Swiss-Prot record:
Organism: Deinococcus geothermalis (strain DSM 11300 / CIP 105573 / AG-3a)
CDD domains reported in the protein's UniProt record: GCS_H
Quaternary context: The glycine cleavage system is composed of four proteins: P, T, L and H.
The protein's name: Glycine cleavage system H protein
Functional summary from the UniProt entry: The glycine cleavage system catalyzes the degradation of glycine. The H protein shuttles the methylamine group of glycine from the P protein to the T protein.
Cofactors required: (R)-lipoate
Highest classification ranks of the organism: Bacteria, Thermotogati, Deinococcota, Deinococci, Deinococcales
Length: 120
């Protein structure tokens, strides 16, 4: 399982990059199986940490995606509408979900080492 050290991780398996980019972890995409659809939030939406903001559907199940921080959605990954498999192939780069202008991080975020220990 990959856990890039520069990211912070939520117990619900979302990651948050220093620039506000959000996605799901390698562990999460592996548990979901092949992703077939991603429902993304609207740009401009104000969200609170812990709020459901997106849905990732796989051949196995649908999973809610929660905001790992409070802030405003400033971008979404439009590539996912035609290529949802990017979430599986590249969860930390091409498979990102949305970007936040962060106002406050969740107090539950973990560093890579703690996240790996909790899910290893």
């Amino acid at each position: 399982m990959q856990t890039p050290p520069e990211l912070k991780y939520a117990p619900s398996h979302e990651w948050l990059a220093p620039d506000g980019t959000v996605g799901i972890s390698d562990f999460a995409q592996d548990q979901l199986g092949d992703v077939v659809y991603v429902e993304l939030p609207e740009v401009g939406r104000v969200v609170t940490a812990g709020e459901t903001v997106a849905v990732v559907e796989s051949v196995k199940t649908a999973s809610d995606i929660y905001a790992p921080a409070s802030g405003t959605i400033v971008a979404v990954n439009e590539q996912l509408s035609g290529s949802p498999e990017l979430v599986n192939q590249s969860p930390y780069t091409d498979g990102w979900l949305f970007r936040l202008d962060v106002t406050e991080e969740s107090g539950e975020l973990m560093d890579a080492e703690a996240y790996a220990a909790a899910n290893g």
